[in-house]
Amino acid sequence: AGAATHIIIAARTSGDQRSKKGITLFMAEVGSQGITLQNYPTIDEYRASEVIIENLKVSKDAILGKVDEAYDVIEEEVDKSTIAACSEALGILEVLKDATTDYCKNRKQFGQPISKNQVIQFRLVDMMMEYEQAKSILYMAITSDLSNPDERRKTVSALK
């Protein structure tokens, strides 16, 4: 949020705490009175911010979508974000799988590569199967009908 000029806020506008109805999305300028950002660095050199909202007042023009109807929109975007995060994780997994395989082919013990050891081969096969399964589920998620909430939830649950 450190570089953002606006933020989207989900707020309960009616109903009780557990109700799916009653959540509304608002857009507010970062410099608005009632919004404070506390920026901090992250381990991977990205920037992050804690957004503190206190007594923020917004006009009706700040409403995004329909009043009290944002729950399903938020759920859909969380699911899409989960697919994106899993896609990144799969890329990391591929790099680790390839690096491990290369290491096992090049590392020698008792005059031969450790990849000749049957136990190592079993583990490499297990790792490859887990990777291929994750990749297949990711492809299924990407090509599924994300506009269908039931199908989207099932697919994202399988992907996690």
What is each stretch, according to the model?
Residues 1-36:
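A short core secondary-structure module
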Residues 3-5, 45, 118, 155:
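Residue-level preference for beta-strand/loop junctions
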Residues 16-21, 146-152:
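Short, glycine- and charge-enriched coil/turn segments that flank and shape catalytic ligand pockets
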Residues 35-132:
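Glycine-rich beta->alpha junctions and the first turn(s) of the following alpha-helix
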Residues 103-111, 139, 143-149:
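Surface-exposed helix-capping loop/turn segments at secondary-structure junctions
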Residues 125-147:
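Active-site pocket-lining segment
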Residues 150-160:
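Charged, glycine-rich active-site and insertion segments that engage polyanionic ligands
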